[in-house]
Amino acid sequence: YYLNRNRYEQALKYAENVLKEYDVLVDYNSEMNKDVFEQGVYLPSTFDWDVQTYTKRIAWKESLYMRYLTSGNAVMTYFPSQSLLDAYEDKEHDLRYRYHFVEDAAEVMFWSSYSYPAYVFFSMSHVLSGPTTAEMYLIKAECQARLGEYSRAMETVNALRAKRMVPGDWVELKAGNVKEAVTKILQERRREMPFSQRWFDMRRLNNNEETYDDVEIVTRKFYKINATTIFDKEEPITYTLEKNSRKYALPISENEIEISDGVIKQNV
């Protein structure tokens, strides 16, 4: 809440309070591995085909509140944009890329005519989205940087990276000023929490006082669909999300508007 309101002192305070109580991180060097699927695809050890089995979700020790994205469809899959794939600049040493991105998933698992990776966490359709200790480290680091303590911010974010990267000189990020520190921390945030927090980050970063952290215009192309058909013989439709677009505002629940006796107005 406080981070989204750009109230960095308060966000820092509560992130630090959480970490004082519980600061455990999963070490991807020793606590993650890959299992081989029967079709030759390597899946992370967190994965479970049975979406009704919650053992591995409950066992994820970074979770502060167990919550995850889900489509309600066991075969719904998260396919990354090229921009997200490019965000993992060190694919050789970044263990998040090694374990959570399944190469050739589209071709091997969904019999697609082309090869493309998929992002996988607990299942094809379940991605961690609840608050975690990793997110608290990132909130703490970003707030420290924005408040001028960029050297300490780098120490904070590097504590997380040490659990996510193969050991080596590439683990530690360095910054010489606030802008550089914030930029690197936001890049790390995107690598750590794809799909779950990106929408909210794009919205807040385009609506704060700084301009150096703005997210540029987002453009996507999708085929027209209905309940039964994908019209893949037609030209795809281009969708554009401008900076500061009102499309970032989600509709307010009609129930909330009604019980407020008109005080709350609908987003338009």
Please give the residue ranges for each predicted region.
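Acidic/polar-rich alpha-helix caps and helix-coil junctions
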Residues: 1-64, 68-74, 83, 88-268
